[in-house]
């Protein structure tokens, strides 16, 4: 059931993000740098001028993470559930229904964590590149440092496959 709940959470996030992206509302909630990047990555005339573009799964991953981090300002795993799909906390059997909320308050969950579930060969590295660029450019151009963006990264990749 845990995987089912996680996938349903991802679907709920995407439903909100896709609606806001298509309506243009998302562009008003992000920084000017993010707005420019999103237009360059996902909008006309740019996408028709390039030979290669992000595919739907990559776009979904990038937009979801940007939405959670920059728009909702998520600080931990529990906040994702509380802000996007509180009803899924009750259905989750991560630790037993009653314990899930308290367990997600533990210090090991007390930082932003984003998971991108993509199969081998579907472009996870391109998603990571985009997210690193998004973080670096926003960190470099923030007038007041918010702590939401960074120029420092540690990427741990087992073997040859990320």
Region roles according to the model:
Residues 1-29:
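Charged, low-complexity intrinsically disordered regions
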Residues 21, 65-69, 135-139, 162:
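Hydrophobic, Leu/Ile/Phe/Ala-enriched alpha-helical segments that form helix-helix packing faces
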Residues 25-117, 126:
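Conserved pre-motif I regulatory segment
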Residues 47, 138, 142-143:
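Secondary-structure transition/capping motifs at alpha-helix termini
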Residues 108-111, 144-150:
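Short helix-terminating capping/connector loops at secondary-structure junctions
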Residues 120:
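The conserved Walker
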Residues 124-139:
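Motif I (Walker A/P-loop) of helicase-class P-loop NTPases
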Residues 126-127, 146-162:
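Conserved Walker A/P-loop ATP-binding site and its immediately adjacent core
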């Amino acid at each position: 059931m845990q995987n089912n709940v996680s996938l349903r959470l991802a679907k709920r996030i995407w439903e909100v993000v896709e609606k806001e992206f298509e309506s243009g509302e998302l562009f008003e909630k992000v920084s000017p740098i993010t707005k420019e990047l999103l237009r360059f990555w996902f909008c006309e005339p740019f996408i028709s001028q390039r030979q290669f573009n992000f595919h739907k799964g990559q776009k979904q991953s990038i937009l979801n993470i940007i939405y959670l981090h920059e728009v909702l300002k998520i600080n931990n795993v529990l906040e994702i559930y509380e802000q996007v799909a509180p009803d899924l906390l009750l259905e989750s059997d991560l630790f037993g229904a009653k314990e899930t909320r308290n367990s997600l308050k533990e210090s090991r969950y007390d930082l932003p964590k984003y998971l991108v579930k993509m199969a081998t060969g579907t472009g996870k590295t391109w998603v990571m590149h985009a997210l690193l660029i998004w973080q670096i450019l926003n960190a470099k151009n923030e007038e007041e440092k918010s702590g939401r963006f960074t120029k420092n990264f540690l990427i741990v990749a087992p073997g040859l496959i990320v």
